[in-house]
Amino acid sequence: MKVKSRYDIIIGEYPFHKELKKEIVPLLEKYPDQPNINSNVKATHTEWDWGGDIASVKKFRKYILNEVPIPISRGGATYSLYCRDFWGNIYRKNDYTDDHNHSPYYMSFVYFLKATWYNSSLVFTHYGQKIRPREGKYVIFPSHLQHHVPKHRFRKSRITLSGNLNFKES
């Protein structure tokens, strides 16, 4: 599925969602808020480099990297993508995310780890395009696109994983 915009937004389903959810939702549900993190996310937020020691998270990150088409070379050099930041967001009642973007990164992503269709959408602000949450769905988008998450209005939490992708010389 593609969202109509001037830029490609990749939407897909992670085939190993149940395994990932089973392993990390219990960790994130009891995650303490990180008070010193400067973020547009007005919800519980993990560290910026969270989950690097968890096998199912490593597998997920690798999968996302493989979903992004990249130029093979630029200016004579060959590049590959790497995940620069990776964090979890735990939205509880009345939590939200302010309008923002992820510049200067190349691409960013959101993964709906725990959500229902009626939870707050991911909204691409300038287009008014709403992406309804569904467990297992990922959304990969150019980092410069403005986006936000409206207030979460339910008792049960909504949990997402997010990250930024950038180039490195191979």
Report the location of each language-model feature.
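Non-heme Fe(II)/2-oxoglutarate
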Residues: 1-80
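Catalytic core of non-heme Fe(II) oxygenases with the double-stranded beta-helix
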Residues: 76-151, 156-170
